[in-house]
Amino acid sequence: QFLGSMLMIYFSADFIVRYGKEIAISLGISKYIIGLTLIAFGTSFPEFVVSINASIMNEPSIVFGNVIGSNIANIALVLSACALITHINSDKVGKQDLIFFLLSSVVAFLVSMDGNISQLEGVILLSGFFFYCYRIKKNIIIEKNNIESVKEKRFDFYIIIIIVCSFFILVTGSNVFISSALSLAERFNVSSLVISTTMIAIGTSLPELATSLIAVINKEYELLTGNIIGSNIMNILMIMG
C-alpha cells in the first residue's frame, strides 16, 4: 500500500505538471514563472493534500514534519542531486522571490516555536501567501507587456480532464499514503513526527525531484529554480497556514 500510494502520487503529479506546463506556455508565460507557479503548485499538491488529511485526522505532527521535511528534501536532496549532474545556472532566479522565501521561513519558525499554530497565525501565513500570489500576478502582467507578440496556442479540452483526474488520483493516493505511514510508525514504535520528516517528506518530494531532474537534463534551469523556490514558499505559507 505504501509503495502503491507513492506511485499514485508521483504519476498523478507528473501529469499535472506536464499538462499544466503546456497550458502555461500557450499563455506566453516565462519558464521561470511557470516553475514558480503551476509546476510549483503541482509538485506541492501532494504535501498540501497530505497535510490537510493529517489535520482532519488530528495529526499536527505530520503537518509540521511534512512541511519542514519536504523543504529540507527540496534543497538537500533535489537541488543537490541536480547539482551533481551538472552546473546549475541560477542567473534567472528572482532575487525578490529568494528573499521572500527566506522571510517566510523566519516567520514560520517564529509562529511555530511554541509547537502550535493558532488560527490567527494561520491567517498571517495565508495573508503572506495571497500577497505572494499578487506579486506573481503583477510580474506576469509586466512580462506580457514586455513581449511584443505572443503566439496564441489553443489547448484541447482533454488536457483539463486529465489534470482533474490526476488531482483525484493524487487525493486518493495521499489518503492511502498517510494511513500506511501511520501503520508503519505503530508497527515499529516510531513517532509520527519521525515518520513525517523522513518517509512522508521524501515521498511527497518525489514530484519535485523527478521534475527537477528532467529540467536539468533538458537544461531548463529556470524551471528547476522556480519550482524549488515556489514549492518551498507554498509549503510554508499555503500548506502550514
PLM ranges: what are they?
Residues Q1-G241:
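Hydrophobic alpha-helical segments, chiefly the membrane-spanning helices
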